[in-house]
Amino acid sequence: MENELMYMNWQEMIQPDKIQVEAATPFYGKFICEPLGRGFGITIGNALRRIIISSLHGAAITSVKIDNVMHEYSTVEGVLEDVSEIILNLKEVRLKTSTAAAKTIRIDAAGPGVVTAGDIASPDGRVEILNPESHIATLSEGATLKMEMTVKVGRGYALAEANKDEETPVNTIPIDAMFSPIRRVNYVVGNSRVKQKTDFDKLTLEVWTDGSVLPEDAVAFAAKIMKEQMNVFINFDESAEPEHAGRKDDSGGKVFNENLYRSVNELELSVRSSNCLKNAEIDKLYQLVQKTESEMLKTKNFGRKSLNEIKELLAEMGLSLGMDLEGFVPPAEDNKEGE
């Protein structure tokens, strides 16, 4: 009995079916997770947000060496910006690298003209510039700008002092580095409905990145980090846990999809389809899914358009028409209505 009670702590807790992707680009993603137990929206949302912001690795320029320049307070002949301004502009360059090893990238430009991040060359092609339009310097007629930069992988924010090592040449200038590929993370917790209950959480998570990592991957990596960090707190053998696949019917038989207990009114059907189901006295999804396509098409005013609408909505919930629900026991309130 003690073990059964222990497993009930998490086995009986409601869990989200899947993550709904509302928007997905290389730079922005919006994800909805529901239903969650009350309080878990803010618990999970806050934890994921903090991990996404602080713990994902990215690439950044950590030092620069400019021809004929000894320190950051210098100027370069024929270049509008001084070295301090050039360094500030280099901090804005966003990179993507395919290796964890330090890499060297270069600029060799001649005026007149504007130097942008797109002028950066990666000798071995392992470093990709994500914002090639980013401004670096302005050169006048006859001016040249030759720079060699070091790219490293890290996480969070590193001050210039931390990017300096004993073997750094005197004319190499370490710079502050923002490694995080994340621009911004936001989450909102709202209400989610399961059957007639509305006291569940819905977590909406928005992630903005610099393009070096996809938003959906950022969320997945953060979830993996959180999972790995939490494993140490589990003080029992998980392999001994009895299998728990879902909700059983009242007789203790096979497991059935939770959505079967929902009302057809929750499907947000068109007025025509909704009226057809009402006329056919179909109130719950378990009644609907037992009907075949041919049976539904015999319903008055029910056509192909309504059929396709219902099939699509059922498929989203893992259901379909013509299902065999042998052993399924309807909710007690439905039995009472039929008496």
Swiss-Prot record:
Q: Which Gene3D superfamilies match?
A: 5' to 3' exonuclease, C-terminal subdomain, DNA-directed RNA polymerase, insert domain, RNA polymerase, RBP11-like subunit
Quote the SMART domains the UniProt record gives.
RPOLD
- GO CC list: cytoplasm; DNA-directed RNA polymerase complex
Q: What is this protein called?
A: DNA-directed RNA polymerase subunit alpha
Keyword Iron-sulfur applies: no
Q: Which domain of life is it from?
A: Bacteria
Tell me its family.
Belongs to the RNA polymerase alpha chain family.
Residues covered by region (Alpha C-terminal domain (alpha-CTD)): 256-339
Described by its record, this protein's role is as follows: DNA-dependent RNA polymerase catalyzes the transcription of DNA into RNA using the four ribonucleoside triphosphates as substrates.
Q: Does the keyword Transferase apply?
A: yes
Keywords of this entry: DNA-directed RNA polymerase, Nucleotidyltransferase, Transcription, Transferase
Annotated GO biological processes are:
DNA-templated transcription
What class does this enzyme belong to in the EC scheme? transferase
How does this polypeptide assemble, per the annotation?
Answer: Homodimer. The RNAP catalytic core consists of 2 alpha, 1 beta, 1 beta' and 1 omega subunit. When a sigma factor is associated with the core the holoenzyme is formed, which can initiate transcription.
Recorded domain comment: The N-terminal domain is essential for RNAP assembly and basal transcription, whereas the C-terminal domain is involved in interaction with transcriptional regulators and with upstream promoter elements.
Positions of the UniProt region annotated as Alpha N-terminal domain (alpha-NTD): 1-237
Reaction(s) catalysed by this chain's protein: RNA(n) + a ribonucleoside 5'-triphosphate = RNA(n+1) + diphosphate
What SUPFAM superfamilies does its record include?
Answer: C-terminal domain of RNA polymerase alpha subunit, Insert subdomain of RNA polymerase alpha subunit, RBP11-like subunits of RNA polymerase
- Give the Enzyme Commission number: 2.7.7.6
- Signal sequence residues: none
Its organism's taxonomic lineage begins at: Bacteria, Pseudomonadati, Thermodesulfobacteriota, Desulfobacteria, Desulfobacterales
User: Mind listing the GO molecular function terms for this protein?
Assistant: DNA binding; DNA-directed RNA polymerase activity; protein dimerization activity
